[in-house]
């Protein structure tokens, strides 16, 4: 599972991904794309 820092989400800073509508900078996303229905773990 990619770390949030490994995700480059369109429209988001390159060091962040979006999990469940929240930009997270730590932990992991369950879905690599960081979709809105994803969760930070």
Swiss-Prot record:
GO CC entries: extracellular region
Cellular compartment(s): Secreted
Signal sequence region: none
Chain span(s) of sequence motif Cell attachment site: 33-35
A Gene Ontology biological process term: cell adhesion
Keywords: Cell adhesion, Secreted
InterPro entries from the UniProt entry: Ornatin
Chief location category: secreted
Task of the protein: Potent inhibitor of fibrinogen interaction with platelet receptors expressed on glycoprotein IIb-IIIa complex. May prevent blood from clotting during either feeding and/or storage of ingested blood.
Family assignment from sequence similarity: Belongs to the ornatin family.
Protein name (database record): Ornatin-A3
């Amino acid at each position: 599972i990619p770390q949030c820092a490994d995700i480059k989400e369109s429209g988001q800073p390159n060091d962040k991904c979006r999990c469940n509508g929240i930009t997270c900078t730590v932990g992991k996303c369950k879905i690599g794309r960081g979709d809105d229905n994803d969760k930070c773990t």
